[in-house]
């Protein structure tokens, strides 16, 4: 580009006069609709003299470094006043923010307009609250550092209709999802309630069936007993004599042994199984420990399952040698006639209570005590006497030692007390009150109680399982509390509350700020000039510094941007005009990179870097996401750097000649004095 500089020689007088005349400056907003390029900063003084510098913005400057040795009578830096005026001019440039895009400025009215509005009842100061200003929401205060200047600024967020609609749509979507989730949870809750109700109904029906089955069993058992009594009556009427009666008693006895009821058969099987378990425990110490753990309720589920295997094994084994079952009471046959002499003699010879024998310390046996089931039939073989006998024998065991059946089987009679060795490790199935009951079709008419010596273990009262039962192929080991002890209350489950740390309220964003976490338009105003607000550039690189409250922002200022924009509109108009079909989409201005066009005018640019500080940490995502993606910005900058031309700066002359530049130096000192007078009060001005 040709330099607009006159090469004609001038006198010293002309040079002095030219120093007083400021260079006309082209300002923003004064461009005409012409294609004349923006040459601000490139124009030379038309009336520059033969001085080694030229006057730009009332300041002496040159493209080359200053040479103060050419000055005959050089003034000091203080007397020249160039340095101080240059700082003032630079600060004014930053305050006017010519490197930023102007978004809003306060409108001024003359006196006539103000008087007219006052007559209409309108406050002129409120007119400025326009729609544009209402769209700007304050973000925070900060400090902008540019060059040698530190400028306090106030940041704003520009309200964006597109972001507002997107936020509204997102809130409605969340609300719908919440409603759907609430509805799904309600349906799931209703389904669980119906399922629970159905299970309760099934349980109730099953219980009714069991009751009916029990009644049928009782009726059937009663019918069998009646049939036997009728047969006995017929036999007594037909055959009267001692030989016949004795023969009939023998028949009845043999019949009673061979036709046990289901409850009695179950009792015999359980006694055999317990005897086999005791025999296995004597041979296997590991099984002995396992039995103790299961009885105390300390066995894990795996050990319980393993113990069930031993139970099934003991049930399938042959009874021990010389072992005979012992029924708690023999079948009782009610008769209307007096018992015969032979029956009285046989009853007198039978001992009412078996004689117990002390067990050896090393033997570990499981004891068989009978306890009548709840709600037993009056015709059953269990009586209060047998229950009291078993309780009495249990107390004798606790006080006088353990009683066990003879393992050698000399007498073959089952004893009432189960063994516990001196060390307290008993081969028991559970704590006192543990019973074995059948779960097959017949209801249980008898339960085997397995007493355990109190070893001082508090955990002995714990149940084997949550429901207090271990089922294994029709056999259930149930846990019952001792008589006289209160049932254990269930502990209420209280849901642990989540410990949520109270977030510092000062670090929370408002609802409006949360909308603009991405793609926010940031504006700012200088506190020294609150009448104008400017936009931060979108094509910029933002870098957060170590203190997390400061940011480094770099961008490129294009000086002939107006010329390039006019060229861009012309190219887009031609491209959209040459579209053959209407179906083809037009080229969008935002997607067209004019700097890559081969006929694009030469770009005149200057790189800029500023520092934003004192920004609260909570606004970090808003600030960092307010610019375009870094990759696209780097591509944009690389295109300008490759095809544009960077403007060179000028060097100021901080010293002037006392004679040759006396008028220029005097004017600079006067301007500086007037600027300082503005900071003094009216009283100080009067004193001067």
Swiss-Prot record:
Residues 168-225 form a coiled coil. Residues 488-497 have a biased composition (Basic residues). GO terms for biological process: endoplasmic reticulum organization. Belongs to the SWC3 family. Component of the SWR1 chromatin remodeling complex. The lineage of its organism: Eukaryota, Fungi, Dikarya, Ascomycota, Saccharomycotina. Keywords: Activator, Chromatin regulator, Coiled coil, Nucleus, Transcription, Transcription regulation. This is SWR1-complex protein 3.
